[in-house]
Amino acid sequence: MKILVCGLPGSGKTWLAERLIKHIKNCAWYNADFVRKFSNDWDFSVEGRIRQANRMKTFADFEKGNGRWVICDFVAPTEKAREAFASDYVIWMDTIKEGRIVSSKLSELKNINNLPFDANLLSQSKEFEDTNKVFETPSKVDTHITHFMSDDEIKKLSEELISV
């Protein structure tokens, strides 16, 4: 099963993904920030976002093709990006109304040596602002999350995913 966890920056995508994989056996996890880092691709144009969705799809399809579950967490701001990824299941983290880079993410980015940008400046940049502007409400959502879930709620969600 290929699961997309999407939503605005700071909505809790990574937070949820890292908790879900603890309850799903044989499950890979790909985080967009790490995939971008290792690809050294920091293009947030429409084309760059589609390329990132296709890159995430490639990793996810590899895992799924080898009989594994996979969770990918990334903004996937447009229907086109979500369609390019072609998930089996969509979790929309609708916990905030405007994306932001949370302080823990800024701290994490500071420890990456090869970033071609200043993380603090990115959080105030046009590209980051554009993410809020271009984000389209997903038309296909299997689970719509509007709050940060408790451990029990996350376990229940993982059980629901396994039974799909």
Spans of model-derived segments:
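Small-molecule kinase domains that catalyze NTP-dependent phosphoryl transfer to phosphate-bearing small molecules
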Residues: 84, 93-164
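ATP-binding Walker
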Residues: 11
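Glycine-rich phosphate-binding loop used to anchor ATP phosphates in small-molecule kinases
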Residues: 46-98
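Conserved substrate/cofactor phosphate-moiety recognition/catalytic segment
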Residues: 17-58
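Walker A (P-loop) ATP-phosphate-binding motif of ABC ATPase nucleotide-binding domains
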Residues: 2
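Walker A/P-loop
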Residues: 14
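P-loop (Walker A) phosphate-binding loop of NTP-binding proteins
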Residues: 8
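Hydrophobic anchor at the beta1->P-loop junction of P-loop NTPases
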Residues: 5
